[in-house]
């Protein structure tokens, strides 16, 4: 009985090793095809060894389908990857790229917010969520996002100038003036900051 158990364990181990080797080989071929711009071939290499419960395969298929401009399919695979590893933000950023192309702005917003629940100081999410809110004229919430970045990185021009404009549209001209001048310090003769200051005068 013990011998049967040992043999069974070895068989399972051997099968697992063979499966790992096939997946590794498929990834290697997939990378080669991607570098040559053969995205369809790159996708087919991975589909040949597809496992629904494999995060890496799903995330990589999401990326390759994005490169192939198959954005809806890309989102579907990224969604599978996210379900497998909900705290991995890389798949969420990948999905955002595809959602941007689909102009699914509400879903983009949802993903940025989901990332910030995992990592509340993720500056990429803070910035682009801020831009999205700013473009919707939600200046109060946009300013909150930009302010968090400026507190962390006071010399980050992009966040300083966006916070300056958000403050201006909030009617906080005193704060806006300080921020526009800071933007000029970081980017001499900056046209956006100069235009902002001209509106305050």
Where is each model-derived feature located?
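Structural signature of tandem alpha-helical TPR/SEL1-like repeats
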Residues: 35-44, 68-80, 101-114, 135-148, ...
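Short coil turns that delineate tetratricopeptide repeat
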Residues: 52-54, 86, 120, 154, ...
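Terminal, low-structured helical/coil segments at or just beyond the last alpha-helical repeat
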Residues: 169-201
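Alpha-helical segment of the N-proximal tetratricopeptide repeat
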Residues: 22-51, 56, 60-67, 97
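Helix-start (N-cap) detector for alpha-helical repeat units in TPR-like alpha-solenoids
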Residues: 23, 54-57, 89-90, 123-124, ...
């Amino acid at each position: 009985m013990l011998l049967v158990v040992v043999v069974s364990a070895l068989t399972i181990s051997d099968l697992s090793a063979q499966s790992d080797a096939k997946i590794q080989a498929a990834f290697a071929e997939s990378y080669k095809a991607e570098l040559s711009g053969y995205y369809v071939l790159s996708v087919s290499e991975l589909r040949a060894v597809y496992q629904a419960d494999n995060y890496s395969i799903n995330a990589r298929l999401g990326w390759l389908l994005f490169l192939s401009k198959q954005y809806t399919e890309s989102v579907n695979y990224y969604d599978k990857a996210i379900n497998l590893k909900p705290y991995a933000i890389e798949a969420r950023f990948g999905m955002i790229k595809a959602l941007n192309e689909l102009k699914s702005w509400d879903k983009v917003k949802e993903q940025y917010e989901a990332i910030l629940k995992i990592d509340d100081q993720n500056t990429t999410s803070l910035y682009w969520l801020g831009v999205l809110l700013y473009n919707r004229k939600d200046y109060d919430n946009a300013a909150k996002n930009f302010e968090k970045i400026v507190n962390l990185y006071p010399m980050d021009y992009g966040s300083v100038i966006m916070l300056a404009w958000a403050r201006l549209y909030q009617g906080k001209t005193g704060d806006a003036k300080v921020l526009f001048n800071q933007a000029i310090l970081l980017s001499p003769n900056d046209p956006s900051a100069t235009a902002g200051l001209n509106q305050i005068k």
